[in-house]
Amino acid sequence: MVPKADSGAFLLLFLLVLTVTEPLRPELRCNPGQFACRSGTIQCIPLPWQCDGWATCEDESDEANCPEVTGEVRPHHGKEAVDPRQGRARGGDPSHFHAVNVAQPVRFSSFLGKCPTGWHHYEGTASCYRVYLSGENYWDAAQTCQRLNGSLATFSTDQELRFVLAQEWDQPERSFGWKDQRKLWVGYQYVITGRNRSLEGRWEVAFKGSSEVFLPPDPIFASAMSENDNVFCAQLQCFHFPTLRHHDLHSWHAESCYEKSSFLCKRSQTCVDIKDNVVDEGFYFTPKGDDPCLSCTCHGGEPEMCVAALCERPQGCQQYRKDPKECCKFMCLDPDGNSLFDSMASGMRLVVSCISSFLILSLLLFMVHRLRQRRRERIESLIGANLHHFNLGRRIPGFDYGPDGFGTGLTPLHLSDDGEGGTFHFHDPPPPYTAYKYPDIGQPDDPPPPYEASIHPDSVFYDPADDDAFEPVEVSLPAPGDGGSEGALLRRLEQPLPTAGASLADLEDSADSSSALLVPPDPAQSGSTPAAEALPGGGRHSRSSLNTVV
């Protein structure tokens, strides 16, 4: 029976479907190439970790609905552990997988690099391994490993040995003795205890550490052995072919310690930052990995107390990728987000902006120049009007009417004056005024009259300091009615008296053109007969004989 749309059975059926089906996943901010966990504090993990046999998400959603992995299952006990990613190394066989029955804690630093570049990390012993292909004897190889804070490798478990045999070590083109099989110096020595029917001896650890190690089986001795050698050094022989390597085929050899061979170094795991630098204990650093915004503390060779910075999503970009070396730096993967055309457009915009700025600046400078030019023209017109007011529009000879001559002639004007304040508007302090002389009015070159002559006009020709310079002049007055004698007397009186140090001509020139000498009143008209008196130079001077009228 199909429920009706308006009945409550349809609502119950819909709720049942929502309960049974998979809940909708929230929108997580995971980058491309990452797996989004359904719930928990860990939201994003690398995509290769999905279905790898080790639950990384807290809800184990990365191992849900995964195909079953067939392989050999080995039980483990105690603190013994194996590498959960064994068999997934370079060149390894994915089907050769060792399951772990011990619960592994989900750690935020489980994917971070704990060894420097070139070293292979093994989680079971928290150690790093590296093969050096340069041919050295046993003792030189041991010193090389010690300089790297390690030693020649020893093995504590069979799983550790399997991990070393499964690795594909770097193979340069020209390596020492590199063939289908290789021998590596390791940290064991075989001590001879007897030479009866056969060589008898025991294995010893050359460099003892804090952890327990297992001893190899009886070795294969070298074909050429010296009877004086009682100590032989161990060599681990492994094969280069992947088929033989993943079947754990290997052998132990006891060789002379002075033979040259490749060697295997082992060191404890350490904190390595994103720039492949070894970090000391207790220091903050950014571990190696895909998150450069992670900050951790180095403790026991592992990053702990990690704090991650959340970066804001880049604006205007739908698909992007994080920079693996710099925090909060993204690379846009949109078709036109990082194209050559976009770069060229940005460059063209920059060029156009520079040209526009240059044109605007040029226009401003041109406008300032035009304003100053108009102000100069207005000032010149004001000066012309000023000259027309004082000289009836006639141009003054010798006056500079150009812009450079402003202020040198009649009533100068400043360039900053726009003329609105009046023709004679000045700024403090005012410029010096220059007196103007009209060219059509001839100015006399004679000096002004003496000061004494201005005060006492009667003594214009008298200088008390020059009493001795004047000689008395006798003047005989004619009788009344003698016209000829009167005219002669008048002519004598009009002549200036000679002075010491000055000629008569100088005295004539020094007199003002508007001055005139008047003759005393006629004795015949006044009714009195004047007595003849001596002129200056005698014992008594006459001060009423001459009058000067200006």
UniProtKB/Swiss-Prot annotation:
Glycans are attached at residues 149, 196. The gene is DGCR2. It comes from Homo sapiens. The lineage of its organism: Eukaryota, Metazoa, Chordata, Craniata, Vertebrata. It is a single-pass type I membrane protein. Residues 270-333 form the VWFC domain. Residues 369-550 are cytoplasmic. This is Integral membrane protein DGCR2/IDD. Residues 69-92, 500-550 are annotated as: Disordered. Putative adhesion receptor, that could be involved in cell-cell or cell-matrix interactions required for normal cell differentiation and migration.
